[in-house]
């Protein structure tokens, strides 16, 4: 018999039902479970797939550059970034009638095009790209890197080039190389690019391959570096009247500490950012020499962890045994990496709008909204993934003997206390926040808005004041003109910071009130509940009160019958599954809050948010309903407009989302009967019954149906909100 899919599992390949296909797809990337897998092959497969991942990323980014160069309007946009709409790529659609062609022909294009809301134009402009030729060059370079990555992935699977397991488990060397090489050297290289190409570009001087050896980035050259007069590099910065991309009002400084924003572009000063990257490079180059390898300098991580025994013995054996536990568990390492990456991605969302790094991006409101929402959603998925792999670690890799009485074992020992505290915090936040919202709703419904319970966020306002925001009148630290910090700030460090924080034209430290207080606690409820479900799922992965022996059942078991009191919904997978709904729910509140507050800020009617956000009906009516009006007007006598595609996507997103419930709220027997009936009808229908299949059709398993339902729910939810966000923002601000 010919080899059938999946080749990696002979047991599955011989399954006579359609289960073979679905289980094959589900376990394709679970290398650990494949036939004949060895530890060595496992590490090598993962290593090779990393190169494949890099190849895909480089190909994708190359495509972005290529399509903008080919079909975009980058050169026109560079001439007038605030009024020309950046084009992502052309739309080729033979079904377009004349009204559609007219609706989507914009940005100075000759035919229908898509507008770019990704911020790439602003990014490329800031780092010194100016012409389509520059974009093509970049696209070709990335294509080359993509090919190199593919070759490297293939090469490291060949017998002669296969790394050994000991190479993969050499944690010190890997950390040193990643810290110094990946972060240190690349940050230094980026500083070099900013100083040699981007900063001259922002001052109207084009530096390319043909002249970069002739153009001095600073009039003093390397002199100040070698004579220790580093302050010369900070003297004569760009003035506040500097026109970005021209020499008008420009200075000669390359590494500054100005603080605040460039008045024209509303983005951070390029010279501040170069300085920042140089500092990061310096720190990481040192950090990359921290761990002991064959050079005999630095620390051994194992020694560090073994020595880390808490004083007084109240926390057991501290970190003993952790080195081998982490170093031998890919899931533990992946969990740590995902947790870090998730937090960083969320921080990127927060900082991209409050401290915009790219020229003119702060005035492109739709792009700001899209980037914030995009990064928050990505962060949510990555963070839930961290806990999923933490749970798999406990099931597959955790060895109680190796970790006796250390911090990991003690987490498991008092997991009831951890889970109950999280549960209490979630209940407290939920009931109090909902209670306030509902009370306020009732007061408005009865026509007595003055009876609302409105709480000023005084602690948060005090923190904002301490950082220099004067409007609350707290007169403390940086907002007090008498404090030494305030006076030092005027001259020594970041003189532009205090101006920026008190200007109302940016998103730094927005003024907050009772509406913010309430939604902040709603978001806190979502975060704590999501965390509760994820933490409980991981800590109970090996066993819980009801089912003390989950280890051999694995990560994703469905129900183990009524024998143990009914074991439905208690696998680690079920916890992950439930947590994703809460994660999406929480990010919904986060993005609604961000978007509504910013829409009112940009439109200059902040009072709408302040007055309507204190009760639920306000959110439903003045944010969701009011802003979706353009998406739900259906067909009208005016024909098509450029928001029509978003209206369609809004509808389609709802459809996909609702389809999720078909899989989430139904029992397996129902599907099996439906399938049997359809198969019966097929076999008895002339012509149709000429088509036969080898596998007996069976319904999805409980876990699979939940996964399919969750996927539709998530994708539909995100599609719906993406269409709403982009249409409601671009419809108002063009």
Swiss-Prot record:
One Gene Ontology molecular-function label: 4 iron, 4 sulfur cluster binding
Key words of the record: 4Fe-4S, Chlorophyll, Chloroplast, Chromophore, Electron transport, Iron, Iron-sulfur, Magnesium, Membrane, Metal-binding, Oxidoreductase, Photosynthesis, Photosystem I, Plastid, Thylakoid, Transmembrane, Transmembrane helix, Transport
Keyword Transmembrane applies: yes
EC number per UniProt: 1.97.1.12
Listed GO biological process terms: photosynthesis
Keyword Cell inner membrane: no
Topology class, membrane: Multi-pass membrane protein
Reactions mediated catalytically: reduced [plastocyanin] + hnu + oxidized [2Fe-2S]-[ferredoxin] = oxidized [plastocyanin] + reduced [2Fe-2S]-[ferredoxin]
Cofactor note: P700 is a chlorophyll a/chlorophyll a' dimer, A0 is one or more chlorophyll a, A1 is one or both phylloquinones and FX is a shared 4Fe-4S iron-sulfur center.
Enzyme class: oxidoreductase
Entry's localization field: Plastid, Chloroplast thylakoid membrane
Amino acids binding chlorophyll a B1: 654
Binding site for chlorophyll a B3: 662, 670
Residues where phylloquinone binds: 671
Subunit-level organization: The PsaA/B heterodimer binds the P700 chlorophyll special pair and subsequent electron acceptors. PSI consists of a core antenna complex that captures photons, and an electron transfer chain that converts photonic excitation into a charge separation. The eukaryotic PSI reaction center is composed of at least 11 subunits.
Family to which the UniProt record says this protein belongs: Belongs to the PsaA/PsaB family.
Function: PsaA and PsaB bind P700, the primary electron donor of photosystem I (PSI), as well as the electron acceptors A0, A1 and FX. PSI is a plastocyanin-ferredoxin oxidoreductase, converting photonic excitation into a charge separation, which transfers an electron from the donor P700 chlorophyll pair to the spectroscopically characterized acceptors A0, A1, FX, FA and FB in turn. Oxidized P700 is reduced on the lumenal side of the thylakoid membrane by plastocyanin.
Protein name, UniProt field: Photosystem I P700 chlorophyll a apoprotein A2
Name of the encoding gene: psaB
